[in-house]
Each structure stands twice: as structure tokens, then as C-alpha cells.
Amino acid sequence: MTALTRLAVPLLALTLAGCAAGSGSAVGPTAPGDTTTPGGGTTTGPTNLSYQFGAKFEPPAGRVVHGLGQWKEYNLKYVPLLPAAHQPASELIFLSIADSLRPWNPAQIAAALAAMDALGRIPLVDIAPRGNQPFPAELAQLADPLYAIDDEVANGTKWDSRLQDLVNVFKAFRKPVLARIGGEFSGNWNGYHPYEYPKAFRKIVNMFRAAGVNNVAFVWCYEPAAPGDFDEQNASGAYKWYPGADVVDWFSIDFFAKGDISGPTSAHNGLSAYGRTLKFLDMAVAAQKPVVIAESAPEQFDLAKPAEATAAWSEWFAPYFALIAGRPEIKWFTYVTYDWTQGSYYASQGWKNNDLAVSGPMVAQYAAELAKPKYLHASETSLLKDYALFK
């Protein structure tokens, strides 16, 4: 899959929607035994639990938070697939700062956060400093394909009132929030500006901090269909994409193609998508930051077709959960249950039905995986680091 075909979810003033394999040695993660009660870590927390990195809202060492994606009608079908004790602990939504199709409505945003809280879910909110997303063909025709407004956010005040609205809404909410600022930052489908994006990220974080907002953890998110230049710096030392350890609480990564999570690590022109995944995870470890998988789904497989569902489990889900098991810095995952053929952005690119509710026997495999004691569900959010400060 090329970068152009990897589209983010259509953004909204409030939307409650809501890579080519190359040559090289084939490598995949090896899952350790993960049926025992987790433990270990270095930092103490509530009830004397320990935390590997000590990050805000990090789960105890050895635990992985179970989260859900962003389409309400599909989320409703996901709930009965799992027992009450294994319901998701977080839910993803998208906000676009410059959406021109829908009115800006802070009250609606506040209501969405409250609705998630009522279900026992921590909001994972994508704050996108851009407007409406063009289709790939339209993007190719733009005079300036860097169409996002991150440069305007970084260098002016035009969007400050909307950003301040978010500051006020999140502060009034008082409960834990993960804020993913400009998710999939280096993907050309988002149109963000190198060197300007990290300045916009820093400005947004500093607006929250200036207002005394301390119930928000800030998330920096990559997608491996994009170039692997996330750690690149210019001659003066400025980062092309990385906002800095002082404003990033969590690293994040999104997975859709099977080549993102296993396979060759190199291609004819350098690293493969999986190689870029491992490079990004290594950067997170070096920075001593936990990782949240903010979006994930097996977009190449139709789960409504038994043969494809079977292939999806062996080629996507099994390597996915093995990667999580083999990389302890991954502390949180979000599954997007959705029939991508119903969304014009995705249907045109060949994305398929990833609604778990139609996947038949595979549901039992998924439920069995989430029954392992390492997964942290809605009933256990009080175990997250610092969670008790924001009840």
C-alpha cells in the first residue's frame, strides 16, 4: 500500500465516526508466554503496583489497555461480543480544528467525552490541526499538498480560540484523556508541514499547561506507510517531526497493513513498513516512553468471508498480538471495528469489512485473546498510573 492510499478517518468539527513488502530477511515477533499474571516494573503507583516508564495513565507493568475505535454504530455491535468484565477501557474520536463542513461545537465535544465516561471508557481524542481531507486524486492535484494548518497554528493566532475551547472542555471534564495531536504526522495524506508540525504540537501542549490542565496525556503518533524520517534532524538540530520528550507523554503507532506488523524488515529502497515499525518502537524505548496503538484493523481482509477471516487471524491478528506480547513498551491498543466498504475514502482504495461482529468463529479467538490476564479492561482503569487523581 502506498502512502497515498492510507487515509485517516474523515475528520469533523466533531466526528463520532464517528506498504509494499520488499526483499530482506523475514522476521516476526515471538510471543512469550503471556497467560500468567503480569508483574515487574520500576516505579510504584496505586496499591503498590509498578510501572515500567512511570508515564501518565500508564498501566501496571505487564498489562495492556484494551481500547475501541471510532464508529458508534459498530462499537454497539462490538460490546456483546465480549463479556462484561472484558469491555474496552478507551474509545477513539476525531476532532478537526479547521473543518469547514460542520459547525464548531464545544458543547458537543463535552457531551461526547461525558458519554464515553459513562461507559467507563477513557477518551482517546485525535486533535487534527488541519481541515477536510482530500481524496488521493484531489491531493495529487493540489498546488500545495501540505494543506494542513499546523503551520498557521505554530506561527499565528487564527486558530487559538478553537484550541482554547478544547483546553476549556478538557479541563472541565476533569477525568483522564489521551490527546493525540496530529495523528499519523508524516503521512502525506494529512498534509502536515515538516518542522512546523512539532512547533504546533508544542504550542498546543503549552496552551493546556498554561491553563493548569493536568488530566491530559499527550500522544505523538506515526503510521508505518509513511517515510521513516520521524527521528530526522536538520543541521541546526531541529527535529523534522518530533516535538520533544518534554511535551510527549506517549509514543503511538497505527497498524492496518499486515506488512506493518511482521515480515521483511528491509526493502529495495531501505526499511520496509515493518522495519519502520521496529525503528519507531526502538525510538520510544530510547526515549523511555510507552506506546499506544491508536488505530488498528486488518484492512486487507474481509472478515465477513470465512476464508478471509481465517487468513486474517493467521496473517494479521496473530502477528499483531505477538508484536504486542514481544514489545513490552506497547501498553495500549485500539481496534477499529468497521466495514470500510461503507466509507467512500476507503472503499475506493480497496479496504474491506473489518467489523468483528460478522467474523463468525474468529470472534471466539479474539475473545480468548482478550481473556488473558495481561489485558486491562474498563473495570480496571483505576489501576492506571495517576488515574485516582482524576476520578
Question: Where would I find each of the regions flagged by the language model?
Answer:
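Aromatic- and acid-rich polysaccharide-binding/catalytic face
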Residues: 86-96, 238-269, 336
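Glycoside hydrolase catalytic-domain groove-lining segments
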Residues: 107, 111-128, 246, 256-303
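Substrate-binding cleft of extracellular glycoside hydrolase catalytic domains
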Residues: 99-222, 356, 366, 379-380, ...
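Bacterial signal peptide processing site
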Residues: 20-24
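Aromatic-lined carbohydrate-recognition surfaces of secreted/lumenal glycan-active proteins
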Residues: 209-235, 288-302, 332-338
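Substrate-binding cleft of secreted/luminal carbohydrate-active enzymes
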Residues: 49-74, 177, 292-391
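C-terminal motif of bacterial Sec signal peptides marking the signal peptidase cleavage site
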Residues: 15-18
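N-terminal substrate-binding region of glycoside hydrolase catalytic domains
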Residues: 45-159, 298-301, 309, 334-341, ...
